[in-house]
């Protein structure tokens, strides 16, 4: 069964998909130095962690995407469950 998205998650992922479809193709070849790309990472992070934490993770990832960073494979961190002991 598919997990339902909150309206904020839907909005964020729709805006990112719009970027992927309408803006990214005009920027030339794949310029992201990471795998998965920053936009794909953002969608995965928002779907897994929710809109607030997912956007925070995506922003941190985008800030690392510059010529001085080596890039490479950088998957979305798994969701951890906090429990009080």
From Swiss-Prot:
Q: Which domain of life is it from?
A: Bacteria
Q: Which InterPro entries match?
A: Membr_insert_effic_factor_YidD
What positions belong to coiled-coil segments?
none
Sorted alphabetically, the keyword list is:
Cell inner membrane, Cell membrane, Membrane
Pfam assignment, any one: YidD
Q: Is Disulfide bond there in the keyword field? A: no
Q: Which compartments does it reside in? A: Cell inner membrane
* Gene Ontology CC terms, in alphabetical order: plasma membrane
Query: Which family is annotated?
Result: Belongs to the UPF0161 family.
Q: What is this protein called?
A: Putative membrane protein insertion efficiency factor
| Organism this protein belongs to | Shewanella woodyi (strain ATCC 51908 / MS32)
